[in-house]
Swiss-Prot record:
It is found in: Cellular thylakoid membrane. This is Photosystem II reaction center protein T. SUPFAM superfamilies: Photosystem II reaction center protein T, PsbT. It holds the Pfam family PsbT. GO terms for biological process: photosynthesis.
């Protein structure tokens, strides 16, 4: 189960970084 824990932690870290960048810098692209 260690692999699952590592994947979960890495996913949470990536999501946190993504939201930090998204909220710090408004997206420049339009849908």
């Amino acid at each position: 189960m260690e692999a699952f824990s590592y994947v979960l932690i890495l996913t949470l870290a990536l999501v946190t970084l993504f939201f930090a960048v998204a909220f710090r810098d408004p997206p420049k692209y339009d849908k």
